[in-house]
Amino acid sequence: MDISNQLTLEQEFELVLYKQKIDPLNLEQAQNLLVETLKTMMLKDNIIKYVVKNSHFR
């Protein structure tokens, strides 16, 4: 069974914390948080690509 698209219990908890953080924000604040989160995800993708590209286990 492929579970790579499912969240772990820890990730589910983290998601609840994010929702609690977002609820009191106004639209502009929420949009800024979204942009920063997307930027962080893109940087994470770049790091993963770099590690895979430079891995000796290919």
UniProtKB/Swiss-Prot annotation:
Keyword Kinase appears in the UniProt entry: no
GO CC terms: chloroplast
Main location class: plastid
Alphabetical keyword list: Chloroplast, Plastid
Signal peptide: none
Subcellular location: Plastid, Chloroplast
Matching Pfam families: NblA (PF04485)
Family: Belongs to the ycf18/nblA family.
Protein name, UniProt field: Uncharacterized protein ycf18
